[in-house]
C-alpha cells in the first residue's frame, strides 16, 4: 500500500537538550533551571533521573545561593540502572510530567557496559560481536527520549579528545562522555 499524505497540523514542539561539562561545572543546576521554566510554561511537573545523588541539595531552599535561592520542585528517581530508568521514563504520563531530565547519561552508558557478563577478549576488553547487545537497550532509551512528546534534558560528563602529534598528545576538543 502506498504512503498517503495527511493534512499537516500544528503541534507543540518538545526541546531535546544536551548539557555536558566537567564535575562541578553547573550541569545539574542549569538542567533544573531549564526544566523548571519548561514545566511551568507547559503546566506540568519535572521527572528527574538522578544517578549521582546530587539533586537533594536543590530540593531545599538555600538562601546563600544567589541565583534561585528557593527550592526546586521535581520528582526524582535515584538509580544508575539502565533498565530501571527505561521502565520509569517510558511509563511517565505526558499529561503530568512535561520534562524529563537524565543526570547523568554517562552513568547509564557505563551501566550498560557493566551489565555485560560475557567472556572478555585476551586483551581484557569486550569482544566486538557483543557490542550490539550492549548498545540495544541504551539506544532504545535514547530513541524513546528523542521521540517522546516531553521536553528532555540530558546531562553528561565531559570527555576530552586528544590527537597525538609527534608523540605528544594535544587536547583538540571535548564531547559528552556517552556512547
Regions found by a protein language model. Name each.
Residues 102-133:
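Conserved P-loop NTPase nucleotide-binding/switch module
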Residues 2-101, 106-111:
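Conserved P-loop
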Residues 56-58, 108-118, 161-165:
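Short acidic/His/Gly/Ser-rich catalytic and metal-binding motifs that mark active-site loops
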Residues 20-24, 143-179:
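Phosphate-binding/switch region of NTP-binding enzymes
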Residues 103, 141-142:
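The first long alpha-helix at the start of the GST-like C-terminal all-alpha domain
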Amino acid at each position: 500500500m502506498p504512503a498517503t499524505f495527511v493534512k499537516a497540523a500544528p503541534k507543540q514542539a518538545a526541546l531535546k537538550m544536551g548539557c555536558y561539562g566537567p564535575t562541578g561545572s553547573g550541569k545539574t543546576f542549569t538542567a533544573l533551571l531549564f526544566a523548571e521554566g519548561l514545566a511551568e510554561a507547559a503546566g506540568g511537573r519535572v521527572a528527574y533521573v538522578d544517578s549521582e545523588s546530587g539533586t537533594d541539595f536543590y530540593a531545599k531552599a538555600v538562601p546563600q545561593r544567589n541565583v534561585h535561592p528557593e527550592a526546586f520542585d521535581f520528582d526524582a528517581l535515584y538509580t544508575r540502572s539502565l533498565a530501571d530508568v527505561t521502565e520509569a521514563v517510558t511509563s511517565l504520563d505526558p499529561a503530568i510530567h512535561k520534562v524529563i531530565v537524565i543526570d547523568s547519561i554517562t552513568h547509564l552508558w557505563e551501566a550498560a557496559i557493566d551489565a555485560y557478563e560475557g567472556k572478555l577478549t585476551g586483551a581484557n576488553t569486550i569482544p566486538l560481536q557483543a557490542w550490539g547487545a550492549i548498545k540495544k537497550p541504551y539506544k532504545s532509551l535514547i530513541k524513546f527520549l528523542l521521540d517522546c512528546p516531553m521536553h528532555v534534558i540530558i546531562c553528561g560528563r565531559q570527555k576530552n579528545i586528544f590527537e597525538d602529534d609527534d608523540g605528544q598528545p594535544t587536547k583538540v576538543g571535548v564531547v559528552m562522555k556517552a556512547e
